[in-house]
Curated annotation (Swiss-Prot):
Keyword terms of this UniProt record: Amphibian defense peptide, Antimicrobial, Cleavage on pair of basic residues, Secreted, Signal
Pfam family, any one: FSAP_sig_propep
Skewed-composition ranges (Acidic residues): 30-41
GO cellular component terms given for this protein: extracellular region
Any one GO biological process: defense response
InterPro entries: Frog_antimicrobial_propeptide, FSAP
The protein's name in its UniProt record: Cruzioseptin-7
Positions of region (Disordered): 25-44
Organism: Cruziohyla calcarifer
Intracellular or extracellular location(s): Secreted
Prodomain residues: 23-43
Family in the record: Belongs to the frog skin active peptide (FSAP) family. Cruzioseptin subfamily.
Length: 75
């Protein structure tokens, strides 16, 4: 009977250790996914900032060109 208890205890202990290791790996994978999502959102934000600045520059250039055309037409 004592041998059976020891075997059962050993099986339960090893199962618990295995479960703990699996949960830890799962948490690490989730953390990596969250970190990748953060990196992607930072890249998107950076890209949108560049597009915004380019748009502003193009808008200013177009406004200046239209203003010059109007000034030339008035003269």
């Amino acid at each position: 009977m004592a041998k059976l208890k020891k075997s059962l205890f050993l099986v339960l202990f090893l199962g618990l250790v295995s479960l703990s290791i699996c949960e830890e790996e799962k948490r690490e994978e989730e953390n990596e996914e969250v970190q990748e999502d953060d990196d992607q959102s930072e890249e998107k934000r950076g890209f949108l900032d560049v597009v915004k600045h380019v748009g502003k520059a193009v808008g200013k250039a177009a406004l200046n060109a239209v203003t010059e055309m109007v000034n030339q037409a008035e003269q």
